[in-house]
């Protein structure tokens, strides 16, 4: 499978995350239930792990469902951020998880990319997808919608819209 679009989306978000810029915006640290920059990075790491599991399952011939529920639980995201040592650790984890996803996705052939997976995607309290999607379609959503959305969000949190 061609991963150039996905790779470009990861490159953009990683460049933003690693650029020190003028300093964080007022919402970078957040409070309570508001997402912070670290929460966005942790979300992307967890989501990558879920996508890696889905891609690997197709490569192994036993397609498993994709559900992003674990990637949106704020307490879990904050615990991951603490465990990885904050922003720097999260950036390194995102580099690794995205590299693994890109490598595995690059091994998919057309038939594997067309494999339908039961998919559930929740955004806040809204269910956006709750139906089977071809694996390639799920990765296209990641490249064209999900990563760019979080790139904008991260830019705002870091004061770099």
What does each model-identified segment do?
Residues 1-8, 14-34:
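An N-terminal domain-cap segment
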Residues 3-6, 10, 87-94, 139-143, ...:
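Hydrophobic packing residues in well-ordered alpha-helices of helical domains and bundles
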Residues 10-21, 48-52, 56, 95-109, ...:
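Structural signal for well-ordered, non-membrane alpha-helices
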Residues 20-21, 36, 86, 109-110, ...:
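Helix N-cap and loop-to-helix transition residues
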Residues 22, 26, 64, 110-114:
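Secondary-structure boundary/capping residues
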Residues 27-74, 117-161:
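Short, contiguous alpha-helical
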Residues 76-118, 141:
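Acidic/histidine-rich alpha-helical segments that form the ligand environment
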């Amino acid at each position: 499978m061609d991963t150039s679009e996905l790779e470009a989306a990861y490159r953009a978000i990683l460049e933003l995350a690693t650029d020190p810029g003028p300093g964080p915006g007022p919402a970078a640290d957040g409070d309570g239930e508001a997402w912070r920059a670290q929460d966005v990075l942790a979300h992307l790491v967890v989501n990558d792990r879920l996508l890696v599991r889905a891609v690997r399952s197709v490569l192994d011939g036993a397609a498993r469902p994709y559900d992003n529920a674990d990637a949106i639980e704020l307490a879990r995201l904050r615990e991951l951020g603490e465990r990885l040592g904050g922003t720097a650790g999260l950036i390194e984890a995102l580099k690794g998880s995205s590299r693994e996803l890109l490598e595995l996705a690059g091994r998919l052939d057309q038939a594997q990319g067309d494999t339908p997976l039961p998919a559930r995607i929740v955004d806040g309290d809204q269910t956006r997808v709750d139906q089977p999607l071809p694996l390639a379609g799920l990765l296209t959503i990641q490249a064209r919608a999900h990563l760019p959305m979080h790139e904008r969000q991260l830019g705002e949190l870091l004061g770099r819209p």
